[in-house]
């Protein structure tokens, strides 16, 4: 199963993540305690042996162009209502792999109805990968009855409040293509190797 460990800030964190995960991410151009500058991000992209996603909440094409040109990444993770025309421009101009986030409510009165609305939203986009999250890196779990429905229709990457203690049960329930974690493998705002190791071992133990 695909494992992305997001929100790295240093070469030391990158090295830890590379030992366990398939991809990582750097937070740019948004409000986050994990946000880093372009130079730091470029250095991490250059050092990395795994894909480094540039993660941002911007819907401004010119900002995405800056991110791509100043970091050198080919992987983008979009947490905004950016339109398909803008995505097409970025894909045609730069050839980037794009993962688009879709928000799932924390609690649903009608999982089937909510899932159908989100399916319509997803189907209005053409992107390389679909990320299901509770919010913009809020670290809270969402209603997995919805993501379970979506995972039957799309290859989804699941995010939102995952940690070493809950990921096994959640992955068995939702059956996603992959998972994305950040705060759930941190200690004192830094990536913790023991938490990352436990998280990845639990994910990899699941046979879907």
Curated annotation (Swiss-Prot):
Gene symbol of the encoding locus: trpF
Entry-linked NCBIfam families: PRK01222.2-4
Origin: domain of life: Archaea
Classification lineage: Archaea, Methanobacteriati, Methanobacteriota, Methanomada group, Methanococci
Assigned keywords, A-Z: Amino-acid biosynthesis, Aromatic amino acid biosynthesis, Isomerase, Tryptophan biosynthesis
Pfam families per UniProt: PRAI
Protein transport as UniProt keyword: no
InterPro entries, per database record: Aldolase_TIM, PRAI_dom, RibuloseP-bd_barrel, TrpF_fam
Family statement: Belongs to the TrpF family.
This protein's name: N-(5'-phosphoribosyl)anthranilate isomerase
An annotated Gene Ontology molecular function: phosphoribosylanthranilate isomerase activity
Native source organism of the sequence: Methanococcus maripaludis (strain C5 / ATCC BAA-1333)
GO biological process: L-tryptophan biosynthetic process
The keyword Amino-acid biosynthesis belongs to this UniProt entry's keyword annotation: yes
Pathway participation: Amino-acid biosynthesis; L-tryptophan biosynthesis; L-tryptophan from chorismate: step 3/5
Catalytic activity, EC: 5.3.1.24
Catalytic activity: N-(5-phospho-beta-D-ribosyl)anthranilate = 1-(2-carboxyphenylamino)-1-deoxy-D-ribulose 5-phosphate
SUPFAM superfamilies on file: Ribulose-phoshate binding barrel
């Amino acid at each position: 199963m695909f494992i992305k460990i997001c929100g790295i800030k240093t070469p030391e964190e990158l090295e830890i993540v590379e030992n366990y995960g398939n991809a990582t991410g750097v937070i740019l151009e948004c409000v986050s305690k994990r946000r880093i500058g372009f130079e730091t991000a470029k250095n991490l992209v250059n050092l990395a042996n795994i894909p480094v996603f540039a993660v941002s909440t911007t819907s401004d094409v010119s900002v995405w162009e800056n991110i791509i040109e100043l970091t050198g990444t080919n992987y983008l993770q979009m947490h905004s209502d950016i339109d398909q025309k803008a995505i097409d421009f970025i894909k045609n101009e730069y050839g980037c792999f794009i993962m688009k986030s879709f928000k799932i409510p924390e609690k649903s009165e009608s999982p089937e109805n909510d899932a159908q609305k989100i399916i319509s939203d997803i189907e209005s986009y053409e992107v390389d990968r679909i990320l299901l999250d509770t919010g913009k890196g809020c670290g809270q779990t969402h209603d997995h009855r919805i993501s379970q429905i979506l995972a039957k229709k799309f290859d989804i990457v699941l995010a939102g409040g995952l940690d070493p203690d809950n990921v096994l049960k959640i992955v068995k329930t939702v059956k996603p293509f992959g998972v994305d974690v950040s705060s759930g493998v941190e200690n004192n705002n830094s990536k913790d190797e023991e938490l990352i190791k436990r998280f990845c071992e639990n994910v990899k133990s699941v046979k879907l």
